[in-house]
Amino acid sequence: MQQYQEGVVEAPFGDLSTYVSTAPQLGAPARFPALRFYSSLLDGPVFWLCRRAAKGLCDDSAWVHASLRVTELIERVGCPVSIEGMENISATRGPCVFVANHMSTLETFMLPGIIRPHRAVTFVMKKSLVTLPFFGAVMRSRDPIVVGRTNPREDLTAVLEGGVERLKKGISIIVFPQSTRTPDFDPQHFNTIGVKLARKAGVPVVPLALKTDAWGTGKKLKELGPIKSGLPVRYKFAAPMDIHGNGREEQAFICDFIGSQLARWRKEDGVNA
């Protein structure tokens, strides 16, 4: 891992609108990529961050530092990273709600290093993540909005109340409206919770399309799936949108944006990607 500077939030992307992995960052397609990736991940940024969290030292600078190391690790096993539309992350004066599809564990690790250098941010996340041994302390340190995923009405209340509270403090929220991680995108299973939160808080929505299935879903343990060396990792942020009326038009735009980006990327990456 690169040297960590206490209290300094790293910003390697600077004012770039687009980032694409280049030869110095990108490793060759790896043999046994899952073994190489997970051993480096657990012994590197995860262990380091858990130790800091146990001591009460998991602040934003540490969170971003670990996040950026995960980006480096996925590049080293031969997965090129592209991030488009980064100018839209800081295009609003105040906080916003990022609404994204949820494909794998990878975006949970990578997004802090992309977004936090521009603005304070946290996640809506399921309760099981904050109760994990060791890593749960990391999640709790981020002051997330916690949902149980068993009672939709209670989850909506938690997101609206907790989200408005954080947004008033200037903290943006990342929302994954799908009920579970999946490589497929179905607008019928992409709920309106992000749009509802933005409307209630009076803040813009920033749509985010992502393709992170280079980190697959495991059969026995979902978080430890196959690592598909050579498969690109992609993010694209759209321009911020204010919510008007009931938000149906904005919800439709978000779904169309994500669906069209995924279709384009799959075509570029190959039929079976």
List each language-model region with its residue ranges:
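Membrane-anchoring hydrophobic helices of lipid-metabolizing enzymes
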Residues: 1-95, 110
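Catalytic core of membrane glycerolipid acyltransferases/transacylases, capturing the structured
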Residues: 37-40, 45-52, 92-151
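Membrane-interfacial amphipathic helices and adjacent loop/beta segments
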Residues: 54-86, 119-161
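A cross-family acyltransferase "interaction/gating" segment
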Residues: 85, 135-136, 172, 183-249
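Residue-level preference for the first positions of well-ordered beta-strands
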Residues: 95-97, 170-176
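Hydrophobic/aromatic ligand-binding patch that stacks against planar heteroaromatic rings
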Residues: 114, 138, 165, 196-197
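Active-site metal-binding loops of divalent metal-dependent hydrolases
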Residues: 179
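C-terminal functional extensions of proteins
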Residues: 239-267
